[in-house]
């Protein structure tokens, strides 16, 4: 069978990134000098998650176009200034300071990789610049720097802890799960997920028999998997980016060890199925924020952005980027200003209802809750026949609100 994706990831990244930069340049040229400046700081070319960053930018720019067509925000246009952080924390920190101090942006979107957000979240908090996360899902990203401190980190996207609560509820409910093994990558994303896995497993009283780690660029995880196998793990919880999850599946195939695989939403990334292959890709189950059973309005937006994103699976990040931009614009209008403090306060008490593409938002944030999407907004997902599909079985059907502990 030919590969699912013909161009290489690098070729896709180079072509897509050039298009994003060109689009950003066109937006700059279309608006006046007093445009409201927004920034994007995230990986667009380097890591397995870069396609998610590119898709988010497409969604953000689509929202900017629609706001312009509707008359602008406070009578002004918006400019998106894009910075590729190459998945490198030092570069991401540099980008953040540049966007705020030199470009004068009033808000920042991103990053793609959770570890980078954790590396620089003190910067926007110190400088009072709201951040609208729409890709990175580490639980700690939206936590305040200290108890009761003003918090400028918001998110419209998935949250690791929410996913972990759900997949471990599935494991606890599944009669075939008796012994669980954890397998996580050593990045900030992987280890943030591990922290959630360990905490929620303890709360739910689950039997964890192995806890192994691997590097994000590893291609052979048979040593770690043999330790899970020797411990009798019948279920593996894998927390990693798309490509390494695919390598885990290939490593399982090498030793003919196929436990139940519950994993992070990074398995929806095209890099996962390209690494695993179509057959092995069908084994894990995971959660996403956008169902493959799209409603007519979502389908219309999908048709609009699909030519600009790498794959169908990246659509959810365009949705997150679009909805996050619209919520930010609502806050700016409500505040009648672009001042960071006033915009943060408006976000925490948004008036009115916004019908987004992920959900209908009604007072989505508060002073202490900065997540736009919650447990009720998650969708069980798998791969079938080389395409994402809704997943359901007797365990999913039997899950009840009281099962989601943590």
Question: What are the residue ranges of the model-derived segments?
Answer:
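C-terminal segment of classical bacterial N-terminal signal peptides
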Residues: 22-29
């Amino acid at each position: 069978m030919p590969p699912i994706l013909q161009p290489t990831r690098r070729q896709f990244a180079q072509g897509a990134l050039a298009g994003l930069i060109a689009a950003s340049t066109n937006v700059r040229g279309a608006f006046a000098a007093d445009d409201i400046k927004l920034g994007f700081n995230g990986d667009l070319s380097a890591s397995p998650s870069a396609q998610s960053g590119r898709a988010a930018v497409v969604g953000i720019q689509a929202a900017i176009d629609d706001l312009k067509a509707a008359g602008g925000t406070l009578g002004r246009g918006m400019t998106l200034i894009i910075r590729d952080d190459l998945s490198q924390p030092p570069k991401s920190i540099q980008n953040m300071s540049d966007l705020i101090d030199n470009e004068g942006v009033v808000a920042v979107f991103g990053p793609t990789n959770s570890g980078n957000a954790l590396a620089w979240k003190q910067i926007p908090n110190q400088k009072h610049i709201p951040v609208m996360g729409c890709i990175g899902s580490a639980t700690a990203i939206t936590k305040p720097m200290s108890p009761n401190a003003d918090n400028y980190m918001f998110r419209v996207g998935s949250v690791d802890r929410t996913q972990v609560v759900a997949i471990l509820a599935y494991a606890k409910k599944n009669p075939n799960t008796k012994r669980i093994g954890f397998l996580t990558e050593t990045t900030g994303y992987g280890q943030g997920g591990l922290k959630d896995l360990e905490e929620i497993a303890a709360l739910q009283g689950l039997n964890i028999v192995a806890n192994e780690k691997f590097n994000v660029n590893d291609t052979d995880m048979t040593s770690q998997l043999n330790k899970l196998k020797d411990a009798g793990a019948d279920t593996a919880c894998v927390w990693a980016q798309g490509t390494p999850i695919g390598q885990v599946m290939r490593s399982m195939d090498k030793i003919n060890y196929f436990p139940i695989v519950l994993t992070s939403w990074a398995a929806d990334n095209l890099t996962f199925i390209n690494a695993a292959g179509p057959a092995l890709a069908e084994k894990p189950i995971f959660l996403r924020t956008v169902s493959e059973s799209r409603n007519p309005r979502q389908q219309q937006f999908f048709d609009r952005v699909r030519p600009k994103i790498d794959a169908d699976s990246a659509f959810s990040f365009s949705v997150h980027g679009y909805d996050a931009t619209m919520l930010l614009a609502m806050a700016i209008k409500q505040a009648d200003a672009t001042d960071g403090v006033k915009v943060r306060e408006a976000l925490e008490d948004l008036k009115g209802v916004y019908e987004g593409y992920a959900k209908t938002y009604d007072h989505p944030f508060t002073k202490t809750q900065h997540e736009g999407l919650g447990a009720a907004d998650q969708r069980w997902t798998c791969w079938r026949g080389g395409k994402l599909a809704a997943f359901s079985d007797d365990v999913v059907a039997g899950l009840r609100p009281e099962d989601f502990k943590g």
